[in-house]
Amino acid sequence: MLRSTFLRSAAIAAISALAFSAGARAEEGKELHVLWSGGQYGDAVEKCINQPFTAATGIKVITESPGGLAKLQAMNEAGNITSTVFDLPTDELKRGTAQGLLEPMDWKAIDPEPMYDEAKDKYGIGTSYFSTIMAYRADAKAPKNWVEFFDTKNFPGKRALPDYPGYTLVFAALGDGVPVDKLFPLDLDRAFKTLNRIKADTIWWQAGAQSAQLLKDNEAQYAIAWSGRVVGKEGIVTSFQDGMLDLSWFGVAKGASAAEKAAAWKWLHWHTNAKNQACVATYISYTGPSPDLDPLLPKDKLKEYPTYSENKKVQWLANAQWWLDNADVVEKRWQEFKLQQ
């Protein structure tokens, strides 16, 4: 008992010391703490933005993975905000906003260079576009649209689908003939009807790399996949037509110090620079929010990028607000559907 009491006291003291240390550094304005997913995208940002940003401003960017809303919620509940910037998918940006966990963006302080309006949110800045698209083996019969993609009679083969309702139900609705401009509010009955029809030919994937691997190994002949995993891969054909365009966001934690917020606004400005975005895109085929990006990208790879003008115009934007408003209903029906598989 005495030992556990001592350990708890020591832990609390350590957390307090860390909080004081982080606060002191933040007040000096010499460090910016970022929680993000990291990976290949993180490596690219480190080379193209973080290192030159530090060289120019003297502000060191300290990153930690993984990021996400759960980390921000935990810090908020503990009353100890030790990181300032968090990377968030669109749905988590909306949830974090609804829960009051994010600071409003100071767009005057960020002073962004030209960027798409959809990437400017009151509580977040969209810095990286990605697409969810149709992919299939080069030796498979080519579908022209989502109705044909889900037609296993005339286009035989296994379908590799994301084991996530937000990335599957929308395309299943399109597969039942729902027009793109009538997609929301989503008709769940039509979406599940499509999935039930092809359940014998469905393989579910949970990690993005699985979609490409299933196609490569010929375990699946068709897939719904994230563009960065399949575009440009040997033996795989892709189409951005009626794909879902989405953004990854950075948000700033409510309760962060004034000094770290000031550093965050400076750092986020660098993400709006087209040349910096083009540099990132040379490492991973996800693009930033600049409308001036196309001329800066490698001409031989233009068709691989989500925001290439010819790709962007044939896609539709994810509707995170609908998913937030209907999360409980969707999750209940999704779990019921999966239990029947």
Residue map of PLM features:
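Early extracytoplasmic/lumenal segment of secretory-pathway proteins
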Residues: 27-96
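Extracytoplasmic ligand-binding site segments that recognize negatively charged/polar headgroups
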Residues: 37-46, 81-83, 87-216
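A ligand-binding cleft/hinge motif common to bilobed small-molecule-binding domains
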Residues: 91-97, 216-217, 221-236
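Short beta-strand->loop
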Residues: 102-110, 122-126, 222, 234-244, ...
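Periplasmic-binding protein-like
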Residues: 115, 129-132, 189-197, 234-256
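A bilobed periplasmic-binding-protein/Venus flytrap-type ligand-binding module shared by bacterial periplasmic
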Residues: 131-140, 173-178, 247-260, 279-283
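Mature extracytoplasmic/periplasmic domains
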Residues: 253-318
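Conserved C-terminal helix/tail region of periplasmic/extracytoplasmic solute-binding proteins
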Residues: 312-341
